[in-house]
Regions:
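A positional/architectural concept
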Residues: 1-50
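Charge/polar-rich, low-complexity and marginally structured segments
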Residues: 44-158
């Protein structure tokens, strides 16, 4: 998984120049767009300035995502810019639970009050990232994953 782009497959590992030295790089291909991304292996990680690339979630984590999506609306800052910034930070993290929170909260806000154009774009992007991972985790198409996500969002908490 690659933040902001969703599910990606490692298609090549090769030595490439980076900051004056030759280093091993991963070439990722994003599932939805076939976008090619080269990342120096040394830049992969969870620290500041690194790219948080990770494995696709397993069945247990998928259950937690479903649970998160069913939770009630969580009160967010009323100030649009603060809410947008907080949601953007969650998306930047690349953590599936934070992406699921953004999808849940923006989807619920859209059902209740509607969204600004910027938040609509953010919801679409967050859903794309979540649904691409969901599809890989379940071994289904992204269209089927989108339907499952919508169904879970529409279901009240157990």
């Amino acid at each position: 998984m690659y933040p902001h782009h969703g599910a990606a497959k490692i298609v090549e590992i090769a030595d490439r120049p980076f900051r004056g030295q030759v280093e091993p790089h991963l070439r990722l291909e994003v599932a939805i767009t076939q976008l090619q991304i080269w990342i120096p292996v040394s830049k992969i990680g969870a620290d500041e300035g690194q790219v948080p690339v990770r494995k696709v979630i397993d069945d247990e984590q998928l259950k937690e995502v479903k649970k998160c999506l069913r939770e009630e609306f969580v009160e967010e800052p009323t100030n649009w810019s603060r809410r947008y910034k907080a949601n953007n930070e969650k998306l930047d993290s690349g953590e599936v639970m934070k992406v699921a929170q953004v999808v849940r909260d923006l989807w619920r806000r859209d059902q209740d009050k509607g969204l600004s154009a910027g938040e609509k774009r953010m919801l679409a992007k967050a859903r794309q990232v979540l649904e691409s991972e969901w599809a890989l985790a379940r071994g289904i198409t992204e269209e089927a994953a989108a339907g499952e996500v919508e169904k879970v969002l529409s279901t009240k908490k157990d």
